[in-house]
Structures are given as C-alpha cells and as structure tokens.
Amino acid sequence: MASGGKGEKILVSVRVRPQNEKEKARNDICDWECVNNTTIVCNNNLPERSLFPSTYTFDKVFGFDSPTKQVYEDGAKEVALCVLGGINSSIFAYGQTSSGKTYTMCGITKFAMDDIFCYIQKHTDRKFTLKFSAIEIYNEAVRDLLSGDNNQRRLLDDPERGTVVEKLIEETIQDRTHLEELLTVCETQRKIGETSLNEVSSRSHQILRLTIESTGREYSPDSSSTLAASVCFIDLAGSERASQTLSAGTRLKEGCHINRSLLTLGTVIRKLRFDPCDIAQSQVENLLKSTAEERSSRMDEQSMFSSMDFDADFRRRSYDSTDLGEPSIINNLTERNFEFLENSEEDDFLLDDKTPQFSRHNLYDDWEELVQITDERLEDACKEVRCIEPEAEQSSGQPAACESHDSLDDIKAENEDMEISTPAEKENVDLSLKTIDVNAKPETYELTLKNSDLEIGPSVEAQESQESVNEEEQMKNEERKMSPSTKQAEQCLNKEENAQSEQQSTEDCELNSLPINNQSEATVEVELTPNDAKLDEDATSRDKWESKQQQEADKDCNESSVCKNIGTDDNDNDTYMALKEKVKEMQKKIEYLMSMHTAEQQQSPSFRRDFKSPPEYFTAKRSRSCRENLLSVRSPHWFESLEVSNNTSPTWRVMQTKASPGRPNTSSISFDSGSSTSIDTRSLKDYDPEMGNSFREFVAGLEEMAKKHHSIDSTPELDYGIPYAPTKTERMEIRPESPADSVAANGQYSISSSDFERQQRKIIELWAACNVPLVHRTYFFLLFKGDPSDYVYMEVELRRLSFLKQTISNDMETSRMQTVKALTREKEWISKQLPKKFPWNQRIGLYQKWGVEVNSKQRSLQVAHKLWTNTQDMDHIKESASLVAKLLGFVEPSRMPKEMFGLSLLPRTENVKSSGWRFTKSFSAIRLTR
C-alpha cells in the first residue's frame, strides 16, 4: 500500500518487458523510456492535437532490466502480506497480449507464498489454517481448476460471503510442497493457445485464492481471537486486436470474450473513481466484486512492451490505472479494515454466548447434545414438582402414595393407547429391531419407577412447574369424584391387565432373559421405530417388575377404601379433562420429535438396518455413529432352534454372479454363520453342474478358511455381542491339517518366502488371464509383502482367481470381451493421468524408460498399455505397480487396511447391498459380510 493524498490508495505498478528474439530481429525501437522509478515517457512522435499525454506517473515503474524479485519486493509484498493481518487483498496482472503477465504473476505468487510460510514459522503463538482454491473464466464460463473436469460452475449470491462459486473445491494446505503441487495442477489445467503474437497465449482469466485463518493458541485480551482473510492472485488474459493477431474461428471467439470482459472491467474502474457501482456485466466483475469493496486492498501490476503498435492500448489502460490511484473511496477502506479488526474480539464473545441452535438438517448429528439439554430441563421441572407435592398433599388431605399411583395408572393407560394399532401396523412394528441395554443411548424413552416417583425422559421440552401442580390437583379431584363401584370396577380391570402383562412378560423372559446384576430400580425402555413407538420391558428386571406390579395392584384395593369417602367439587370433571388433554399433547410432542429424528436417521447414510421378524431374528443392531457394544437378547434356546431359511436366516453373503446373454441365471450362493452351506433352490434349476461343482468347491474352501481365520482370534465374538467358546467338536474341526496352514505361537499363520513367491507369481499370471483391473493388482501387490498374516488373503485371492478363470473359460466370449473393454477403458483413464501428475521433463524420461518413442503419437497411452504385461519379470511388475500408485495417489502400504480385500469375518452392522460379481467392475471386494 502506498500512502498519499487523503489516505491509502490502490498501488499501481508498471513493468516494461524486454524485447524478445523476434523483435530484435526486426530491429524494433523502444518507444517507452523509464525516466525514474515512478515516471514513464513515450518517445514516439505524437500528433499536435493528440488527446493522449506523453508522460505517465505511477506508484512504481520497473524497467526491462528489473528482476521479478524486485517487482515483488517494491510493488506487491506489502499488499500480499496484508492477508496475515486479516485484510483481504488482490494482485492483478493487467496488460495486452504477450506482455509477460503470466510470467510476472508466477514469480509474484511464488515469492508471496515463501514469505507467508516464513511468517507462519516465525509466529508459533498462533495456529494458521490455509485453504487454496483456483478458478478459470474461459469464454464467460467459470471452471474449477482443481476438480479435474470441464463442467461449468454457477455463480451464487451469498448474503454474507458475497458472490461464490457453486461446488468450488477448497484444498487445505498441508505444507509448502502440497501448495506447489496444486499450483502445478492449475498451470496444466489452464487454457492456452497459440496466436501470431504469442505461442503460449493465455486464453482465460485465472484467479488463485489463498484463504488464511489464524487463531491464538493461548487466549489473551490483547490479541484478537481469530483473523480470516483472503489474497487473490489474478492473471487476466491479455487484450488483443484481431487485425494484429490475425485470429479466426475459436481464437477470434476467445478474443471477443476477453476484450469484452476487460472493457467492462475498465468501465467499473472508472466509475469507482467517483462512487461505488453495481455494474457486473461479465463473470470477471462478478467474482472480483469483493476486491472493490471496503474491506480489501489491491495492487494492479501492468505489463507492457516497447512496441509502437500498442501505444493506444497502453494509454487507454493508463487512464484506468490513474483512476485507480484516486483515494476518493479508499479512505473508508482502511478505516473499516481497522474497525473490523478491533471489533473481531467482541464479535467472538458474542458468538460464544449464543445458545446452540438445532436445525432439521443437523438434528441427528447433535442428537446427544439435544437430549442432554432436555434431560436437564426436565429434571429441574421434576424437582420443582417434588417440592410443591407436600403442599398439595396438605391442602387436599390425600396421601401421596394414592396420588402418585393413580397418576402412574393414567400414564400407563396413555402409553397403552399409543401402542394400540391395527394388525397391519403391528406387523410393521414387529419388524423393528428391539434393543434392551442397561447403558443404552438416549434414543429411547425411559420410565423409571423409584420411590413411587415417575420420571419421563427425554421429552421435547420440560413442562413448567405450574402445569405440573395442575396435573397433581386434577388427579386428586378425579380420585375424589370416583364412586366406590367405579373404583372397584377400575381395580378389577387393572388386575386383568396386570395379569395379561405378567403372562406376556413371562413369555418374553423365556426368549429374552439374560443374567445381570441386581438393581434397585426397574427400567422400561421404549424404542421408536419408523412406523410406531413400542413399549418393551427390560429383561434384566422382569421379576422385580412383576412383583412391584402385584404389590401396587393390592395397594389399589387398600387405598380405594380411604379415597372413596372424599368429597368432590363441581368443576373436578372439567379439570380432569383439561389435564388429560395436556398429557396427550405432551405425548404427541414427544412422539413428533422422536419420529422426526427417526426420519432424519433413515434419510442419512449412517442409519441402515436389517428388518427381521422377531421370532427368527431378534438381535441388537448398531449404527455407524454408535461405538458401544450393545447387549443382545438372543436366548440359547432360540439359537439352537434356528432354522436356515432363504428369507429370514442371517447368512454370509459370499458373491452373486450377474446374468449375461448366453449365461445361466444364478443368484447368490450363501452359507450361514454356522458354516453350513445353503444354496437357493430356485437358482439351481438352470444351473450348470460343472460350474456348480466348482462353485461349491470355492465356497467350501472359503468356508474352511473362515473357520481357521476365526479360530486365531484371542477372544472371538459373534455378531450378537456374546463371547464365543468353541465346543470340543468344533475345536477338532478347525484343527490345522497341513504345515502351511499351521498356526504359529503368536496366533498367526506361518508361510515361507518360497511359498509366498510361488503364490504371488501364480496370482500375477491369473490376473493377466482374467483381465483383472490394474488398480486392484497394484493395491494387492503393494499391500501383501509376505507377512505371516498374509497367508489367508493370498489363499483367498488365489481361489477366487482360479474360480474366475474356470468360469470365464466355461462361459461364452461375452464375459471375456467385457473384461477386455473394461481393462482398456482403465488404461485410457490412466494415460490421461500421466500429463497431470508428471511435468514434461519427467514424462520424457518416463517414455524412454518404458521404450516409447518421444516423437510418436499417444505416448501416454502406449505407456499405459505396457503396464503389467510381462508376468515373468518381477522388476517389471514392481515398476508397473509403482507407476500406477503414483498416478492414483495411493497411500502408504502400511496405512492401507487389509480388510479392504474382503476377508472381514466379523459381520458388518449395516445392510450392505450385494453389488454382484460384475466382470466390468473392479474385483477388489469379495466380502464375507452379512
């Protein structure tokens, strides 16, 4: 920023490009002369009545002998580093075509990044977060340079951020090398073309934006809490004349769009000299609108060269730049900047004091916090009710036990009314998975009975204390109004209902009972399903609940004689009805919130469950967000009597062969968790016997390996969450049969290096025969290095490929052609990644290394077709895997999970749809999942 006049103004610098070889060959004369570091003079003879001056004054003028480092230090450094102080800044490169704008901007960007990282290293007291984005405007179409596609992005108006680009990728910078890689990607993605004036002319406007957020590691009142600002490096395309560039077709169209956008930009600059304006006739002005606002600073770097033909262009742009230097609207700029920095700390305090709000789109993310808040509010309300309860007893003269018990009966009746549904609805409710857990998450309602007090949690909102008092009084009035006959009839009805509930609970206990420690209170959990809310009693407290119910039923009979003689008032009936309506309204609110939360969970990808009918499948499921092991209610009697069914039994899905023309239709072949093979009879009608035998052998082999792999775990667990202890017969069945399959002392399979190399070579040959995708080969080759634990995975891959080869050989040519086409498309995609990942000099060495002529066509595609071709040369295989890994950006092999190749014997919690064994897709996911 340069100070002058009434305040700070936009810094404008001019750099003169030296003559190139063509200009020297033509003996061109320099028409511009740098008098000093602020003035430039035109040496060309001007007409007497010329409207243009011969001398121009700018903030900085750099001659043709000035290096880019000096241009940055004197003209752009202060503006670029404003972003570290929380001030938005922008650096433009503006000039005619072939004037060296891109060359200058690349150097300025590099030096600015160096200074920013140096500043970050020195100021260790603050935590910095850097985000980088890059966009390109080509023919008035906005494109994201980091996305890798040519899709056009829309411009959206945000009330807080201004004009934003739709789905713009913002990369979080990890280090200096990461930023250099992103700059290289932007350089390769930008549109360039050849014209008569420039061989590598930029045909688009490029905007590189670096956003820096800094936060103090230790809070102090003297420093602001958080600073956030952005610096934009803008390389505008050069203006050009069609008569000089001799362009036509696409180049002419590009030049028209470039000139139109630059003309609009000049108009905006001239109008900004007097008043702010809302002119946005092109995409450039839309995106750069924030650079002309108050909270920003800007530096305009003009590039020019000494040519007589371009004097008019430079003079026209000089007028625009002179307009930029006027400080008429810039005075408010710095004042607002400093005001913004001073008020940032106060704004942070205001934001911290605000109560967290919950909206519908993030309801299931903050569910636990919402439940905790509502629990606290409800607990406070219950305490107030308990404090007021003795006063109400004294005023009415009625025992508290009778009152609390009657309210308990009413609430139970309300809950039973909520459970009543049609038979069809009950079937839907029964399809839900019930969870009975002492330490369950607060996704369920809990009715806790302790010392004859009733607590309901969590609810939508806590009822106020006055409403609670009204409930108690209305309950008492209703009790007074009831006649002895009515009381006796109600008690008989309650006894019948209690007897039915005891009988039902006894039946449920036979199914769901589990040993658990004695507890001092009984808990009833209600888990809401997508269709209805159902009340389920805790299996660990069945006996206590039954005895408590019987005692309270007897207590009703004794207390009825005490309560029947109490008089009633005329308005008791109305009061009771009003209370009942309030209770119903509260229940509706609770039901609405829980149903809304359930619906949000169903829409989210983290809420996927298998719905099985309780008689066959009655176990606990767990969502991805829940990391606790939930107790299941599966009785040994039910487990022993489990019958394998095609529709209801939990089975291990191994694979599914997709039907193709000329190929028999086959559905999934599965074996259950007990390792007993079960094959769908419907799929065996048209099944090939030879293919079926091989398939059975493959499944049997995997089944045997699954047993062995399951036996090496120290404490294996079934999917039910119950520790598994193999019987004597099972231990005999899983005993190793060969030295290769023996279990070492550390609990892993032992495998010699010769056996590993033999299996590896055989797998590589089968990969080539089956046309397995190169991505899968690379992952597998880099991940499994011969560790003892790799034996199972190598054996599974070998069996899978052997079965696949036999299947393809028995099948028609359709499947083989499909795999060949898929592999060809993959190689074409890999060839497109070579220019993006490697610069030109590295690609030359790569072509020579793989035996591709440098002057030939489609060199990258030739390299892609040479990958993984020589299956006998291990050096060739290693080089192929290394190249594919670099192109695809694979992580380190030590960080890649081996379970990604499908030998995850523990069942997955979500309902994963079987994608089938498609020959046109990757063969990297054969999972033993349920």
Curated annotation (Swiss-Prot):
<dbReference type="InterPro" id="IPR019821">
    <property type="entry name" value="Kinesin_motor_CS"/>
</dbReference>
<dbReference type="InterPro" id="IPR001752">
    <property type="entry name" value="Kinesin_motor_dom"/>
</dbReference>
<dbReference type="InterPro" id="IPR036961">
    <property type="entry name" value="Kinesin_motor_dom_sf"/>
</dbReference>
<feature type="compositionally biased region" description="Basic and acidic residues">
    <location>
        <begin position="473"/>
        <end position="482"/>
    </location>
</feature>
<protein>
    <recommendedName>
        <fullName>Kinesin-like protein KIN-7J</fullName>
    </recommendedName>
</protein>
<feature type="compositionally biased region" description="Low complexity">
    <location>
        <begin position="459"/>
        <end position="468"/>
    </location>
</feature>
<dbReference type="GO" id="GO:0005524">
    <property type="term" value="F:ATP binding"/>
</dbReference>
<feature type="cross-link" description="Glycyl lysine isopeptide (Lys-Gly) (interchain with G-Cter in ubiquitin)">
    <location>
        <position position="805"/>
    </location>
</feature>
<dbReference type="GO" id="GO:0007018">
    <property type="term" value="P:microtubule-based movement"/>
</dbReference>
<feature type="region of interest" description="Disordered">
    <location>
        <begin position="449"/>
        <end position="569"/>
    </location>
</feature>
<keyword id="KW-0493">Microtubule</keyword>
<comment type="similarity">
    <text>Belongs to the TRAFAC class myosin-kinesin ATPase superfamily. Kinesin family. KIN-7 subfamily.</text>
</comment>
<dbReference type="Pfam" id="PF00225">
    <property type="entry name" value="Kinesin"/>
</dbReference>
<dbReference type="Pfam" id="PF11995">
    <property type="entry name" value="DUF3490"/>
</dbReference>
<feature type="region of interest" description="Disordered">
    <location>
        <begin position="655"/>
        <end position="686"/>
    </location>
</feature>
<dbReference type="GO" id="GO:0008017">
    <property type="term" value="F:microtubule binding"/>
</dbReference>
<keyword id="KW-0505">Motor protein</keyword>
<keyword id="KW-0832">Ubl conjugation</keyword>
<keyword id="KW-0547">Nucleotide-binding</keyword>
<keyword id="KW-1017">Isopeptide bond</keyword>
<feature type="compositionally biased region" description="Basic and acidic residues">
    <location>
        <begin position="533"/>
        <end position="558"/>
    </location>
</feature>
<dbReference type="GO" id="GO:0005874">
    <property type="term" value="C:microtubule"/>
</dbReference>
<feature type="domain" description="Kinesin motor">
    <location>
        <begin position="9"/>
        <end position="273"/>
    </location>
</feature>
<feature type="compositionally biased region" description="Low complexity">
    <location>
        <begin position="666"/>
        <end position="681"/>
    </location>
</feature>
<dbReference type="InterPro" id="IPR027640">
    <property type="entry name" value="Kinesin-like_fam"/>
</dbReference>
<keyword id="KW-0067">ATP-binding</keyword>
<dbReference type="InterPro" id="IPR027417">
    <property type="entry name" value="P-loop_NTPase"/>
</dbReference>
<feature type="binding site">
    <location>
        <begin position="95"/>
        <end position="102"/>
    </location>
    <ligand>
        <name>ATP</name>
    </ligand>
</feature>
<dbReference type="GO" id="GO:0003777">
    <property type="term" value="F:microtubule motor activity"/>
</dbReference>
<dbReference type="InterPro" id="IPR021881">
    <property type="entry name" value="NACK_C"/>
</dbReference>
